């Protein structure tokens, strides 16, 4: 939200100044898209002071703000939510690393992120574009549907072939052919999906 820089000369404190961090242009739109994709709640975890965090959160329509947090505090908040839900965490700093490791899914910024955050995250946004997360959510949903289709289809066909084989209605070579066929159907099903 902002960066504080302290100035000293010859071991004497001369003052400090703050540089405001601006949110990325796509952040508000990104948060709205997340809601459309089933993400229930967005929560800000920041080490910055509460007043500034609240202003920032209002601009972005963030549901909940937790400010003035140390890395261990961020981890505690994340673990509280993780008891009842899956959590996804997006961060860029070294202070975000503990939460990134603990989260069910985490993203770091590749260009602006610290090395520790990049190492701790599950995914790295190479160009720091948050819309990459939306694409990841879309791909993971398609993948989940595909996996379920393949599992259910494979089990169903194998059970049918097993029953037919048990009653002698299908020869051994037919069962082997059906088994290979199930594998081919699963592969073809996977190939039909365009990501």
Task: Give the positions of each predicted feature.
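Membrane-embedded transport module
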Residues: 121, 126-195
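Conserved ATP-binding TGD loop and adjacent catalytic N/P-domain core of P-type ATPases
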Residues: 2, 6-149
């Amino acid at each position: 939200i902002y960066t504080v820089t302290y100035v000293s000369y010859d071991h004497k404190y001369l003052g400090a100044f703050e540089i405001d961090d601006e949110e990325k242009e796509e952040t508000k739109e990104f948060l709205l898209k997340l809601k459309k994709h089933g993400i229930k709640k967005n929560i800000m975890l920041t080490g910055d002071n509460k007043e500034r965090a609240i202003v920032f959160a209002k601009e972005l329509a963030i549901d909940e703000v937790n400010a003035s947090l140390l890395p261990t505090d961020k981890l505690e908040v994340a673990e509280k939510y993780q008891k009842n839900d899956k959590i996804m965490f997006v961060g860029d700093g070294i202070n975000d690393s503990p939460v990134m490791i603990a989260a069910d899914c985490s993203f770091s910024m590749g260009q602006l992120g610290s090395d520790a955050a990049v190492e701790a995250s599950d995914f790295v946004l190479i160009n720091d574009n948050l819309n990459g997360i939306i694409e990841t959510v879309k791909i993971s949903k398609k993948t989940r549907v595909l996996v379920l289709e393949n599992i259910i289809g494979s089990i169903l066909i194998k059970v049918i072939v097993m029953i037919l084989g048990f009653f002698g209605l299908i020869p051994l070579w037919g069962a082997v052919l059906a088994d290979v066929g199930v594998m081919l159907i699963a592969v073809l099903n996977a190939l039909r999906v365009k990501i």
